[in-house]
Amino acid sequence: SLSELGINIPANKRKVGFLFQNYALWPNMTVYQNISFGLSNIKEPMAKIDFETKNAARLAEILKAPAEVVSVLDECRDKDGKLEEKKAILKLIDAFTLSQYTAKKLYDYHLESGKDGRNEAAALLAKVDTGRKSAADAGYTLDEEYRFCRDGEVVMQTRKLTKEEIDLTVRRVSRIVKIGMFMDRYPAELSGGQQQRVAIARTLAPEPTVLFMDEPLSNLDAKLRLEMRYELQRLHVETGSTFVYVTHDQ
């Protein structure tokens, strides 16, 4: 059919991103809301995933090596040696590629107080077994990504992205453009270059298959412009998307 060929696709289903020199961020939304807004409107066939079991397995894996967590947390102490929770959660998000929700759970184990973590890991692994068992009782298996499978096929369902998936995507694109620390700020509180980086992150978040860019790096300083150009080239190769890039640089 024409729509399978990519012709006649309704506007809200087109995976197209636009990035201009004048990026229009929503002034009444935080950086986080600006990036996540488009993601919360996506509704399409996706794999059905058992996130609770997946996150329990991930946390169990991390808790088995508590020293790594403690060394990340130790970097987040103020001059009086007190742990700064907000900074610690941001660090855990990036160090272990977690969502803010899972990072908060990890933080709440308070491994910095010398706890071993192995008992908690065992409890989480029991939870993983329960998750696999209840999937089996319902006639499914869980694959290594914790997707529900039946007869070896991944089960698809038309659904919206979960809070967890949205958060992981926001964190992933904010790592690319280095804006993780600005999540709670409003556009007016950012410099032109920072706003430009938010606009880039917002455009990349839904993983467009075609990306139109007109001077997207013009407001960045020379070092960041080079980094972002390299990053866009890498994304181009990694995602296999089509990039149309307009520049007036000689």
Feature locations, PLM:
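ABC ATPase NBD coupling module
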Residues: L2-G17, N41, M46-K48, A60, ...
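Catalytic "switch" loops of ABC-type ATPases
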Residues: V16, F20-N28, D249
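Histidine-centered active-site/metal-ligand motif
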Residues: P27-N28, F96, H110, H236, ...
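Nucleotide phosphate-binding site architecture
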Residues: L2-S3, W26, G180, S218
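ABC ATPase nucleotide-binding domains
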Residues: Q33-F37, N41, M46, M156, ...
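Post-kinase regulatory C-tail/linker adjacent to protein kinase catalytic domains
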Residues: E52-E61
